[in-house]
Structure formats: structure tokens, C-alpha cells
């Protein structure tokens, strides 16, 4: 009888400890990694849906492990910044006119899906090992449509899916940049041979963020990706980011039609004026 009582007591104690441990784990998650920027550097975390800054810190070591309070699941942007030693003429001019904006900095950001019910640990990851000089050279010469070099990864299925989507985007950004480089050579040829009307047409094309053929191909692949994973919470947020006009709604109509009726009812509150 005593042995049975002792066993039950041990089991209940164990269950209690497990419960308490589970509650402790649920209070926060962690973002960790190695960032090769100049010390000190800064990290800011934003909720993409609301634009709210939900976390901010300055770090004096390249290796970090930061506890983050429990946040609503969704897509977040992690922004890393640090002081710039190398400035362009336009940077100096901007600072002289608007010193209140502060000294120019390097910025590197990425987005990721955060859900502590899926994962409590999020790891900063780069496409290769960079030192500070290499990273700053990339950022100094970077154009807006170049692929990202940084991700925040976890074991959560939704974040893995979101990283797949980022890889899809990066592939088309690279393709867009490559084809623009080829068009730039065509423009240079026209100018060299005084074919200014032709050069003007090419120049107008190059000013657009995306080449039409590449953009259309990207949208096709986005639609296939979203339809394939239509039941994921990630897809609803991606769809919301992409559809901001009647034209967007028509472009992604196949995705909308694939959502179950309960999701459509939620989306319709925002999209109803695009459906008219």
C-alpha cells in the first residue's frame, strides 16, 4: 500500500514538474546566431501585419542568444543595423540636410514566420560564411532587387514553408537582375551607335522594378505554390501581402477560389471593394 502511494506521489510530482516546465518554456522563445557586423550592432523586430516594433536591443558581441516574449504567430521582420564608415556623396548630403535622421548605417533584414507553439528556437542563417568587410561590400553595392543573403530558420513547419517561399522569390530576383544586366548591355550598344530612340525604350524598361516576363512567371509560380499549401496559415498572410488592388485580386483569383469558405469570409471584409 505504501509502495503504491509512493509511486502515485512520484508520478503526480513528475506530471507537475512537466506542467511547470511546459509553462516556463511557453513564456518566451529565443533568436540566436552569429552576426558578422561591426560591434555594436542593433536588432529590431517588427510585426509585418501591424508595423509595430515588438523588440529592440543593442549587442556588443557577434554571438547572441536573445529571449523574445511570446508574440502572436505570423510574419516578422528582423532588421540588423550598424555604423557605416564608408559613405556615398548622397549619404553625406542627406546627413548635412537632415542630421536628425542620424548617422547613416548599414541595414540587413529578413522576414520569417514566428510561432512559439511550433518552435521556441530561431537561428540566424547566411548563404555562406561572411566576414564584416565582405558583408559591408555587398550592402554598399547592393541594389533593391538583389536576393537576400540572410534567413531566420527554425524547426517549425510553417517557418520552413515560408523559407521555401523566400527561396522562390530570391530565385526570380536573381533572374530579374541577370536579364536586366543583359538589357543594360543592349542600351549601351544603342547609345554607342547613336540609336537614341531605341535606347530610350530600353531605359524605360530598366527603370521598372521587374521585367514583365519575369514578373508574370513569378506570379504563376506563386499561385502554384500557394494553391499547393493552401491550408497553411502562412499562405493567408502571403496572399494578404500580395493583394492590395483590384488588379492584384484578379491576378491571384485562383488562390482566392482555392481558400475554404470560412477563410474567404474573413478575407472578404478587406477585399470586398476589389470584387466590385
Question: Residue ranges of each PLM-predicted region?
Answer:
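Charged, long alpha-helical assembly modules
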Residues: 195, 201-276
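Residue-level detector of solvent-exposed, low-hydrophobicity positions
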Residues: 12-16, 21, 83, 119, ...
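Bacterial Sec-dependent N-terminal signal peptides
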Residues: 1-35
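Sparse, context-dependent recognition of short Cys/His-centered cofactor- or disulfide-binding micro-motifs
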Residues: 8, 30, 97-99, 210, ...
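A non-transmembrane, solvent-exposed segment enriched in polar/low-complexity residues
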Residues: 23-205
Amino acid at each position: 500500500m505504501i509502495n503504491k502511494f509512493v509511486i502515485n506521489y512520484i508520478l503526480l510530482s513528475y506530471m507537475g514538474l512537466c506542467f511547470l516546465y511546459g509553462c516556463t518554456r511557453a513564456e518566451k522563445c529565443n533568436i540566436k546566431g552569429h552576426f558578422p557586423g561591426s560591434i555594436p550592432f542593433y536588432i529590431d523586430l517588427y510585426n509585418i501585419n501591424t508595423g509595430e516594433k515588438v523588440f529592440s536591443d543593442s549587442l556588443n558581441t557577434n554571438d547572441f542568444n536573445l529571449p523574445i516574449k511570446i508574440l502572436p504567430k505570423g510574419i516578422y521582420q528582423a532588421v540588423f543595423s550598424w555604423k557605416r564608415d564608408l559613405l556615398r556623396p548622397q549619404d553625406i548630403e542627406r546627413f548635412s540636410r537632415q542630421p536628425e535622421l542620424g548617422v547613416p548605417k548599414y541595414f540587413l533584414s529578413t522576414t520569417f514566420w514566428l510561432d512559439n507553439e511550433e518552435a521556441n528556437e530561431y537561428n540566424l542563417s547566411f548563404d555562406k560564411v561572411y566576414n564584416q568587410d565582405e558583408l559591408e561590400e555587398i550592402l554598399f553595392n547592393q541594389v533593391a532587387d538583389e536576393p537576400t543573403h540572410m534567413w531566420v530558420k527554425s524547426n517549425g513547419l510553417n517557418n520552413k514553408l515560408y523559407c521555401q517561399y523566400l527561396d522562390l522569390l530570391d530565385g526570380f530576383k536573381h533572374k530579374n537582375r541577370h536579364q536586366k544586366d543583359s538589357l543594360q548591355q543592349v542600351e549601351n550598344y544603342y547609345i554607342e551607335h547613336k540609336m537614341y530612340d531605341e535606347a530610350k525604350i530600353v531605359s524605360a524598361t530598366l527603370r521598372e522594378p521587374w521585367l514583365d516576363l519575369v514578373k508574370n512567371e513569378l506570379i504563376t509560380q506563386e499561385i502554384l505554390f500557394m494553391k499547393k499549401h493552401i491550408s497553411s496559415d502562412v499562405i493567408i498572410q502571403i496572399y494578404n501581402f500580395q493583394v492590395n488592388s483590384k488588379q492584384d485580386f484578379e491576378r491571384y483569383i485562383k488562390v482566392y477560389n482555392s481558400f475554404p469558405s470560412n477563410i474567404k469570409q474573413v478575407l472578404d471584409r478587406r477585399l470586398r471593394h476589389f470584387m466590385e
